From Swiss-Prot:
Zn(2+) binds at residues 183, 187, 193. One of its GO terms (biological process) is cell adhesion. Its cofactor is Zn(2+). Binds 1 zinc ion per subunit. Residues 30-55 are annotated as: Disordered. Its EC number is 3.4.24.-. One of its GO terms (molecular function) is glutamic-type peptidase activity. Residues 1-19 form the signal peptide. This is Astacin-like metalloendopeptidase. SMART domains: CUB, ZnMc. InterPro entries: CUB_dom (IPR000859), Hatching_enzyme_Uvs2-like (IPR017370), MetalloPept_cat_dom_sf (IPR024079), Peptidase_M12A (IPR001506), Peptidase_Metallo (IPR006026), Sperma_CUB_dom_sf (IPR035914), ZnMP_hatching_enz (IPR034039).
Amino acid sequence: MDLKMLLIFTAFLLPAVLGFPIQDNYENSTATSESTQVTTEESIYDSPSPTETDSEDDVIFNRILEVNKDSSRYLQEGDIVPRRSRSAFNCRNCYWPQSMDGIVRIPYVLDPTYEENHVRGILEAMAEFETLTCINFVKRKTERDYLIIRSADGCWSNYGKVGGGQTVSVMKGGCMWKGIIQHELDHALGFLHEHSRSDRDKYVKIMWEYISPACRPDFRKFENSNNLGLPYDYSSVMHYGPHTFTNTTGKATIVPVPDGSVHIGQRLGLSNLDVAKINKLYNCSRCSTIIDAAFGSLKSANYPRNYSDNTNCVWLIRTRSRKISLHFRDFDLRRTRGCQGDYVKVYDGSSKYSPVLMNKTCGSQIPTDVVSSSSLMLIEFVTDGRDTASGFQATFTSARMQRRFNTRN
């Protein structure tokens, strides 16, 4: 049973819960793709949506450290299984192979002790990789190299492909957050923590005086790291929090430079630059954008001029509210029978396996407003190789923003 079938199966058993191609122009988002334009969670298995009262240290990595403090395993940087050779942190053989169709299929097996809700949470975290990148996690058949995802003593992973069956520990309870699962899977793909980049001193200052000697190796810099020619990402799912490993309450161990007020770390999951790095490392061509905003707008590339042929783009909207309302202001897609050519499709969640809110829609009639049941909504735009039209323009708001507008009125 592959990932798609497992998701359908678990969705049937249980109620649903809850790049880089750079986009042409964007505001109020950090975006990824050539065919779109942009302006501008909560079950126990989704990283909770942030609130205005969240602590700046309430980030994914600090949750990992809290769980791992009782682990008996020796871990580098808090959650990485040491390799036999230090030079392996820049090895070309640590990456998973790409198939002829451009997809990177990574076999996995799941711990049989996981319950159905644990499985659902892990599969939903995996599904975002498949939606936003060319990484597909597939159930193992007979492959030699594969991931063993099990509930061991904490949240941890190997760095990259090590050969044979390799463990990704996702402990029941403490590690069952989408952001944590994605953090550990990103290690398995071959990514280190963001602060260990060779160019990190241009972007952050390490406050060594607040780091105990035993923890200083966790802040080492890899001089030969592969930065992929992409910017440093303060909001990466792989970034430490500002006070990670501090030995003095209230004193930061990592300070952004030159602007120390920049927030580092987050609790939602993959960032746009995380997605961009995956796609560049694995030579993927994906048109995908993550929008972390309470309101904004999006439109097809070239709008109001005609969009391009053979487009396949997605936008993942993540808000602080429970619900998202999508309103199409203009809509003009080539009409075909059953909308099998060009279409827009909207999902109630973060992947193409999520429930459908608006099925394939084409033509020139403006669709009715679409409202999600959670803080996540995915919009998919697909075109074939035939004639095109002017495309679409849409705006979105969160329930929180709507309440504010209603209060003012």
